[in-house]
Swiss-Prot record:
Pfam families: Flexi_CP. This is Coat protein. Coiled coil: none annotated. Residues 1-24 are annotated as: Disordered. GO terms for cellular component: helical viral capsid; ribonucleoprotein complex.
Length: 237
């Protein structure tokens, strides 16, 4: 709310001076000074976007590249879903190596499909776009991510064991027509966040910030932080 203008008058003077507070709305509000009313809030439509999720423009560009690669148009969506489902098993980082060829891409390997995606956006952003689709797919077939146990997930949290899990509830992602079969539980969300935190901690332990490779500086260590130094207190399971 803008503060009201203040009026001051010098002693012995009949002239008053009105001082307007910076940011006060002009008497005639138009353009960028227009004041919204209730009708705007009840009728306006917000276009949801997230920098963690591939945009519709990104998908259009990827679609064009895939067409040039001879991915069949009538199974292109299924090829995308298959790739993202595969990433739920193996990961969606830039370093992840895709395995084999899916059944919907006309013999084009998942690695080539992923390489085309990376020309437009990150693989994880692409996977985030289809996270709700993969979530429903896994639940329908009772088929959790392949590496859930290796990542330290409990059996009751195993369906959350993929690194783009946050996309399941992101409003910028593509939602199946029937919606989510079930929303992620609070325990699953906590497990996914904990797993992400552990990965970051381990990655930090494997990196170094040495300015010199002289042994007097590195003391013969490859990494800058020992595993013990990288250990932090994690939230309870």
């Amino acid at each position: 709310m803008s503060a009201p203008a203040s009026t001051t008058q010098a002693t012995g003077s009949t002239t008053s001076t009105t001082t307007k507070t910076a940011g006060a709305t002009p008497a005639t509000a138009s353009g960028l000074f227009t004041i919204p009313d209730g009708d705007f809030f009840s009728t306006a439509r917000a276009i949801v976007a997230s920098n963690a999720v591939a945009t519709n423009e990104d998908l259009s560009k990827i679609e064009a590249i895939w067409k040039d690669m001879k991915v069949p148009t009538d199974t292109m969506a299924q090829a995308a879903w298959d790739l993202v489902r595969h990433c739920a098993d193996v990961g969606s980082s830039a370093q992840t190596e895709m395995i084999d060829t899916g059944p919907y891409s006309n013999g084009i390997s998942r690695a080539r499909l992923a390489a085309a995606i990376k020309e437009v956006c990150t693989l994880r952003q692409f996977c985030m776009k289809y996270a709700p689709v993969v979530w429903n797919w896994m639940l329908t077939n009772n088929s959790p991510p392949a590496n859930w146990q290796a990542q330290g997930f409990k059996p009751e949290h195993k369906f959350a064991a993929f690194d783009f899990f946050n996309g399941v509830t992101n409003p910028a992602a593509i939602m199946p027509k029937e919606g989510l079969i079930r929303p992620p539980s609070e325990a699953e969300m906590n497990a996914a966040q904990t797993a992400a935190f552990v990965k970051i901690t381990k990655a930090r332990a494997q990196s170094n910030d040495f300015a010199s490779l002289d042994a007097a500086v590195t003391r013969g260590r490859i990494t800058g932080t020992t595993t013990a130094e990288a250990v932090v207190t994690l939230p309870p399971p």
